[in-house]
Amino acid sequence: MLNPLNFITKFIKSSNQKELDRINKIVVKVNSLEASVKNLSDEDFPKKTTELKDKLKNGENLDTLLPEAFALVREASKRTRNERHHDVQILGGVVLHEGKIAEMRTGEGKTLTISLAAYLNALTEEGVHIVTVNDYLAKRDSQEMGEIYKFLGLTFGFINNDQDDLERKKNYNFDITYATNSELGFDYLRDNMKFSKEQMVQRGHVYTIVDEIDSCLIDEARTPLVISGAAEDKTEQYLAIDKLIKRLLPEHYEIDEKDRNILLTNEGINNVEKIFSDAGILKNNNFYDPENLSLVHHVNQSLRAHHLFEKGKDYIVKDGTLKIIDELTGRILEGRRFGDGLHQALEAKERIDVQAENQTLASITYQNYFKLYNKISGCTGTAATESQEFYEIYNLVVVIIPTNKEMIRKDWNDQIFRTEEEKNKAIIEKVLECHKQGQPILVFTSSINKSEIYSKLLNDEKIKHVVLNAKNHENEAEIIANAGKMNSVIITTSISGRGVDIQLGGKKGSQPDDELLENKNKIKSLGGLFVIGTERMESRRVDNQARGRAGRQGDEGSSIFYVSLEDDLMRIFGSESMNNILQKLGLKDGESIDHPWINKALERAQQKVEARNFDIRKNLLKFDDVLNDQRHVIFSQRNGVMNSEKVFDYSDEFLSEIISHLISLKTQKLSTTKNNEFNNQLKTLLGKSVDDNEFKNVTELKDEEFKNKINSKFLEARNERIKMLDEEKAKEVEKRIFLQCIDLNWKSHIQYLEQLRQVIGLRSYGQRDPLVEYKKEAFFLFENLLNKLKMDFVTILINLKIVQEPSESISRPLKKETSNDPNCLLIKRKNEKISRNEKCEATGKKFKNCCGAL
């Protein structure tokens, strides 16, 4: 059977050259304008930008403006940064403008390439978002490329974690904005929780360029962005369960490392029932009794925490806080927590403060966030291996851009050992061999724990080195920039794969130019930077990123991977008969082997993992699309009301729907059930606005009279508000109430869907498709949400009474009475900010109702 991944890869190779040939014709046009643009004065460039904007407004499109725009950016870069865009960068710029992915090797100048498409698309004056992998790069790239944009007459800015809303809004209103994917996503969610358009910071989603697009859309696709609030505190339960779980033995559970799952055996279930019954936690002496569902969930999470999640690999504990480590990048994911109670289970395991669970207020995945943009493009050094996923999920085509200079890096065949100990010994010997000559070495490991193991082995050999991992990443950029120095030895996790070029001889400016050049030539003669991979990662793309640190822009360099059969990849996904194959090939203890059979086995193992992860992401997206469609409806309705000048029309429409529904129930109320439903809903709606006698009379009215009665009650309450406030303020009250009703009901709805997702998989045991079942249930819940939202909104409006604030004459005596009281908050907390709900000892009232009301 044809492997679809292989087919796609072959298709890309055959079609890629055709695409490059087509784009090269555009590059020729750009080059033909270079001489004329060179004759422009500095003052002419902003004028040219204005001319291009005018042409766009007069009917020309961006494609026709591209050659002149790119020529202007190239010349502006030469004058401001002394950097001229190479033809391959012009190629990449065209690919980005066309909404595709440009695969460009490390060191080929992706940041400069992005400036071309960013400038062209900024001419629309609708904003361009450039996505970077961290805050440091957002600020750096904005400032460096900002020199070009400013010269051309464009505005630019960046978004960082410590900015307030005013600063964020200002930066989003610039022509070009640099930000991380998480900042963009969270700002979108927060904007859809605001109460006025003026409070929102983003202005739309038109065009985005994602730097290191594979990291954002592939690696982080499974991680949703979540804004959460405090939920019920179950701290003691987590601690109690953790204590009891430690009493289980290995025969009480089975571990599935492939799917990262753990299941209790029959013996384990019996043991759990005894342990938890003795502790008084289990109900009805049956672990799987419906009343113990919460307990089952917490036990499973505690088991996963103890046996599937490893400190130093999946997380670290720093300053008493448990922090997640990204499995692919090796970075700490600041501010993120494992969901579904797993984070609390890990905190209990590590005996640190267990923080309360959070309830989701709003969430979105990166997959669905980036689908908000009219056009998306990106660049990376490693996209071809994931081309099928990019096309299938995002409809993005990958175009492989040739290097400016020929790639001369040597990628040696993998060295395979039987045991990890033999492999480690060989790695240290290789480091010693290269280090004696002064050749710079970059050693890649899969986790913090592994990096510390190799550090200890090098310390034993008295080799000076630097360890770079999530524990000590503060000087990452500086360390990596100088990784090309003589005698440099750096041990790192995948953290050092992005954003910073390694220059042979050292970072420019770190030493005199002549000394730098001399050192560079020495290192070239030694073979350049030597990259050592201590094992194959689960993704070929991550391996390629490691290789890509060497051999930038035609420099010398080399790479090699050392592999053992005890490595996680081979142990979990490799063939069980691999050891027998090595024995047949005559591999002796301590020896390595390089053989096509082994390389094929490694490739198959990685493809298994890649295919499995792709399926997981595809499946998650199918489920998330259900929530995404509902999110779109809710956010659209919310924004519609928030931005509307005719909020009364929304209220009247909802009232009309509710009355029609009640009349429908009224005509069916022959049955006791329908009668109760009608009475309950009508009582809820009218609340305290009618007494029992009037309520009875309303239920007996004919349909038209019934409708008029409810309408009159609603309008009576509204007119009272208008009389006391004025019409504009009354509209603002209705608008604010509606937005709060949406937020409250949406929050509950998300929680219901999360709970549904956790259990829907069980439907497969009844020969039902979990996805189909989830869609049905989610649709039913969404219908209920919309109905409840309207009922809550109209009910509040009918029953809402505006209370007149105390007049000036009533307030003054209070001030006089308390102004000299030493317990008065205004005196006790002079010049300090006082909470509106803080109790004032002078009056016994909340601050907002006494001194704070003055």
Swiss-Prot record:
Disulfide bridge map: none
Keyword ATP-binding on entry: yes
UniProt keywords, alphabetically: ATP-binding, Cell inner membrane, Cell membrane, Cytoplasm, Membrane, Nucleotide-binding, Protein transport, Translocase, Translocation, Transport
GO BP term (any one): protein targeting
Gene3D superfamilies in the cross-refs: Helical scaffold and wing domains of SecA, P-loop containing nucleotide triphosphate hydrolases, SecA, preprotein cross-linking domain
Coiled-coil region: none
Listed EC numbers: 7.4.2.8
EC top class, as a word: translocase
Chain positions recorded as ATP binding sites: Q89, G107, E108, G109, K110, T111, D501
Oligomeric and partner information: Monomer and homodimer. Part of the essential Sec protein translocation apparatus which comprises SecA, SecYEG and auxiliary proteins SecDF-YajC and YidC.
Function per UniProt: Part of the Sec protein translocase complex. Interacts with the SecYEG preprotein conducting channel. Has a central role in coupling the hydrolysis of ATP to the transfer of proteins into and across the cell membrane, serving both as a receptor for the preprotein-SecB complex and as an ATP-driven molecular motor driving the stepwise translocation of polypeptide chains across the membrane.
Protein name: Protein translocase subunit SecA
Provenance organism: Pelagibacter ubique (strain HTCC1062)
